[in-house]
Amino acid sequence: MNNKKVAIITGSGRGIGAATAKLFATNGYAVCVNYKLNASAANAVAEEIKASGGTCIAVQADVSQEDDVTRLFDTVDHQLGVVSVLVNNAGILRQQMRLEDMSADRINAILMNNVTGYFLCCREAVKRMSTCHGGVGGVIVNVSSGAARTGSPNEYIDYAASKGAIDTLTKGLSVEVAAENIRVNC
């Protein structure tokens, strides 16, 4: 373990998440690269960070699954230290289609990954960051989308609705934990 600040970036094996993980590492954070399926991509990001002198681990966890989220945070606690920053970035998007063509399985998968996953990760971060639980505070960033405001008709309103829920989660949680030295933003 080290004395660096610790950042967990969910869904950071590629794209925005990978770039965010590298940015935090460049700024001196010990980083957890979280991934669901693509171990080789996540490990490549982690190795790049380590090759640049950073501290990084890659941890597989499906953020829509409560046990996986608990294991993710416990692993970070033991290998890097207590989380200082959580970036909720993991999310899924499916083929564009109209609502009448969407199955309940599709809608539930989007909501489990994009909403429940953020709730679970926020919960575990707050347990560790909150001054009410002996923490020193921290930062939670929930990655949202402009689709939350446009609704994305004829494309993916299920995804848009999930991001609207994230905006509401962020607003409510930011007020709930502000006095505990935790900042929450989109």
Question: What name fits each language-model region?
Answer:
Residues 39-40, 60-72, 104:
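The beta1-alpha1 cofactor-binding region of Rossmann-like NAD(H)/NADP(H)-dependent oxidoreductases
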Residues 84, 100-119, 141, 159, ...:
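Catalytic Tyr-X3-Lys loop
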Residues 4-5, 54-55, 82-83, 129-144, ...:
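Active-site loop of short-chain dehydrogenase/reductase
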Residues 13-14:
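Conserved glycine-rich cofactor-binding loop
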Residues 113-135, 174-175, 179:
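Amphipathic alpha-helical dimer-interface segment in Rossmann-like NAD(P)H-dependent oxidoreductases
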Residues 93, 135, 141-165, 170-179:
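Catalytic loop of short-chain dehydrogenase/reductase
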Residues 27-44:
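Conserved glycine-rich Rossmann-like NAD(P)H-binding loop of the short-chain dehydrogenase/reductase
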Residues 70, 93-108, 127, 131, ...:
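Conserved mid-core segment of classical short-chain dehydrogenase/reductases
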